[in-house]
Amino acid sequence: MVKIVFSGPPGSGKTTQAKRVAEYYGLKYFSAGSLFREYARRKGVSLEELSRIALEDPSIDLEIDRMTLETVRDSDDIVIDGHLAAWIVSDIVDLKIYVTAPLTLRILRVAGRDNTPLGKALAETLIREYSQRRRFMEYYGIDIYDTSIFDLTINTKLIGVEEAFNIIKSIIDKILKEKHGSMSE
């Protein structure tokens, strides 16, 4: 049984790494961000608009956080991916990984991933990050820029996807060996 959470800002590479880890180890993959995106779709608003709405309506975040926590509690082998997820599930996971990269690189990645002009990607990302930081401080008293809760922080600026995965894999293998023998063998 292993539970791993990936957090970090948009475009950092956290989703890429979380999905790779889930696939490699045969773990369930859960995205808290997909809940937020689905909520936006149901409401017929963009992510940045939902972020603005969530500044005034805490029930949005609280519901997503509740669903994330329940999913992790009810799962044995799972990888969780979310900007703020690590703070929500901190006490019930085996490994907390923070993935980051400089803003310029993250904007380029977001624009490429979403097929969005750079200016729009920058505006949307800044709005989302500001809104998330403010909401989490207000609702939980947590500063998402304080990464001291994480077991591993990895900056993807100078390393590729495979190099980052190998670093993460080495830590996971160590944890699995200590817990109950390696799942990757």
UniProtKB/Swiss-Prot annotation:
Gene3D superfamilies: P-loop containing nucleotide triphosphate hydrolases. Its main location: cytoplasm. GO terms for molecular function: ATP binding; CMP kinase activity; dCMP kinase activity. GO terms for cellular component: cytoplasm. GO terms for biological process: pyrimidine nucleotide metabolic process. Pfam families: Cytidylate_kin2. Keywords: ATP-binding, Cytoplasm, Kinase, Nucleotide-binding, Transferase. Belongs to the cytidylate kinase family. Type 2 subfamily. This is Cytidylate kinase. It comes from Desulfurococcus amylolyticus (strain DSM 18924 / JCM 16383 / VKM B-2413 / 1221n).
